[in-house]
Amino acid sequence: MAAQRIRAANASGLPRCKSEGTLIDLSEGFSETSFNDVKVPSPSALLVDNPTPFGNAKEVIAIKDYCPNNFTTLKFSKGDHLYVLDTSGGEWWYAHNTTEMGYIPSSYVQPLNYRNSTLSDSGMIDNLPDSPEEVAKELDLLGGGWTDDQKESGRPYSNNPFWNGVRTNPFLNGNAQPSTDELNPKSTVDLLLFDTGTSSFTESSSATTNSTGNIFDELPATNGLQVEQPVKRDNPFFRSKRSYSLSELSVLQAKSDAPPTSSFFTGLKSPVPEQFQSREDFRTAWLNHRKLARSCHDLDLLGQSPGWGQTQAVETNIVCKLDSSGGSVQLPDTNISIHVPEGHVAPGETQQISMKALLDPPLDLNSDRSTSVSPVVEVKLSNLEVSTFIILEMKVSAEVKGDIFSKSTVVLQCLRSDSKEGPYVPIPLAYSYGDTIQVQLDNLEPCMYLAIVAQGPNILYPSTVWDFINKRVTVGLYGPKHIHPSFKTVVTIFGHDCAPKTLLVSEVTRQAPSPAPVALQLWGKHQFILSRPQDLRVCMFSNMTNYEVKANEQARVVRGFQMKLGKVSRLIFSVISQNPNELSDFTLRVQVKDDQDTILTQFCVQTPQPPPKSAIKPSGQRRFLKKNEVGKIILSPFVVTTKYPTFQDRPVSSLKFGKLLKTVVRQNKSHYLLEYKKGDVVALLSEERIRLKGQLWTKEWYIGYYQGKVGLVHTKNVLVVGKARPSLFSGPELSTSVLLEQILRPCKFLTYIYASVRTLLMENISSWRAFADALGYGNLPLTFFCRAELDSEPERVASVLEKLKEDCNNPDNKDRKSFQKELVMALLKMDCQGLVVRLIQDFVLLTTAVEVAQRWRELAEKLAKVSKQQMDAYESPHRDRNGVVDSEAMWKPAYDFLLTWSHQIGDSYRDVIQELHIGLDKMKNPITRRWKHLTGTLILVNSLDILRAAAFSPADHDDFVI
């Protein structure tokens, strides 16, 4: 029966799997001709006009013996020729030896002719022959005949995985000739594993691989005939020593569809022997060229960032510590968790649990009778002195079918191993219902690997385990954070439901160090039930005419054996915009079809937005927006509420205290830098640090309260002792009213635009009465602020604001007040902190623009390294008829720049003011030396949280405006 089954399988012309072995039915008699019944594609059969599905196999040669330890790997000896079908496994390649198929370790083989003189890159001229005849003989082998009729002849190079019709050995010919097959159109449906691809990502590097990281695609094998120029045998250099090089490949690799370019690299060609009078001159020139070629890459092509050589999913992991009370640890974005019962470790001890999801299963877990239905979960424990077990719970990607026969044939089984590659042993399930399972783990080890498989040990051919389960396959679409005029997406197919949020894409080059990998984001994923492992055709389309998927990349094929082995498949699609000036988000439709072109599933994914138009980036390190900052900066014109809190004048309790380690007396007095004496105690408003320049260099500072003043104290001069108030603390107690008065000191020195202030208040204050009370106009009627009756609440708010402006600017008023300070104080008493920080940020940017004025270009370079063209663009709207900007109007381009720059920084008002202060400190003659109030503003915005926490009742916060 086994032999009949093998013959039936081989009747279709497909090679057998290693797991079937070489079986002969002895009952039918044994003869030597029995082996001839096993038919597989030969190397020559792979090169016919109508190739088999394995027509893109790449020939390699074994460099050492390999004896397999499981049924899925292939045995071979040193010197054997193998034919690789898939290199996506990284360390393991899928290959056949014209008899059997299986996995081989990639380190045990080399591409055919890898050490040939045209491909070696040893960096030396070695293996010198003893006679000219030996060189000529070798060149005969490499270049064919020496006659002139070779112009019309051709020679196939399909067996050489690196050959693509470009000659790189200067001892053969210095002129690169295209192959005839480059003129032939490619099929629009390319195999995933061996796409010879002409897309830009294969051009971006000298050795950029395709979506599977296949090294054979660095220089794709051609299927046609190479057009060669005759090799001049009478040239004396061809009678001399041979040389080896692979260096020029990064320069000479040109694709048939690439337009000619005129750049520095266009003229970077190998020297031709005929150009030199002696062998030594040519050798020196050629070695110099190779040295240059090894260190250079075509920057025009590399500029098509990012490189797209290899894709690697970022494995999801988590590390957590639990004490004796137990708890649960869940892998982020997955349905995998570990439950630790109470009393697992002794009181006072901890258990550190590390979990990681490995996406590609080992080879042993998938066959006709078994298939993996979960990622391999790596569990590491720090403490083995435990008294209880732990429970692993997860959802799997398959369910056994509901009929009795399926339930009796296939079961879900948990396998465990101490090594990632196995061997795996089964352990019983504690609980199983539908697609949810629980496993009780005892006999704990420091490192364990666990996987769930659907197994049917008694399944007979031709049935497989897939016939008895409903297995879900996950399709994920990954792309960049923002879309661009030309970008690439990666479609991944997982044999389980664990799709990571990030996919790393790195460019493969022969350059060291390699470029940093680019992280792609998961745009969307979709699951569908796959009835059996089969070839899948994945197509992608755009719903907008402005965007199109490259024609030769609209469809990709995933081989059925990859689905059977549970390997993650990665397919790259290039998307191009027809009009780069009209970028917008759009929808991509992904279709998955079977080998009969029937749609199995399809889904749509919305792309992200294009990036902001300005390329200005913050110069400093970005700090994450604090949770309590998020709601404060968002202002809405639709806030409708009449209830405002009452500002409470009470002591500030949430202070920390520190002992001063040094006496500081400042020669240049500043309102915002404290002077103090060694041994005294200072109260710290928080332990958050502020960065600004001291006398010589940038330092870190705490906001402190000492002897009735709020200011900055150098962090190295303070020893933080905690929240307990020391008995040595002297000076008046810090209350909310004192703190409010102290931090508002710089407000009266800030410049403002009244119209913008009026608009903001009209949009965000919903009660003119509360606003008037906070300003000190208590119990005054509306007619006191305006003569006519106003119908809308925003107009009433504007009338109150107008009254404040008149009072502050009245020269007859003996006690003149600052408009900015009174306004900010009133808003803080109303708990409108979001509105305050918006006003403060606008005030600071405008004041800085006015103070910097004509020096704004220097500030722009310090903040964002703005180019001269960008600076001119900021000034162009403000130029007069003579094309110059008046000195009194120079604040306008400065303000335009600062507004644009602040939007690039983000929503954190603290970061905007902090980075602005650092940028001003970096100027040659910084204005912060004479204009200290930006430092006070930095103290203000960093003290708002503690003021708000002390002045208002937390129980009422939910009912108030921002």
UniProtKB/Swiss-Prot annotation:
Keywords: Coated pit, Cytoplasmic vesicle, Endocytosis, Membrane, Nucleus, Phosphoprotein, Repeat, SH3 domain. Coiled coil: none annotated. InterPro entries: DEATH_SH3BP4, SH3-like_dom_sf, SH3_domain, SH3BP4_C, SH3BP4_SH3, UPA_SH3BP4, ZU5_dom. Its main location: membrane. PANTHER family: SH3 DOMAIN-BINDING PROTEIN 4 (PTHR15603:SF3), SH3 DOMAIN-CONTAINING PROTEIN (PTHR15603). Homodimer or homooligomer. Interacts with DNM2, EPS15, clathrin, the adapter protein complex 2/AP-2 and TFRC. Interacts with the Rag GTPases RRAGA, RRAGB, RRAGC and RRAGD; the interaction is most probably direct, preferentially occurs with their inactive GDP-bound form and is negatively regulated by amino acids. This is SH3 domain-binding protein 4. It comes from Mus musculus (Mouse).
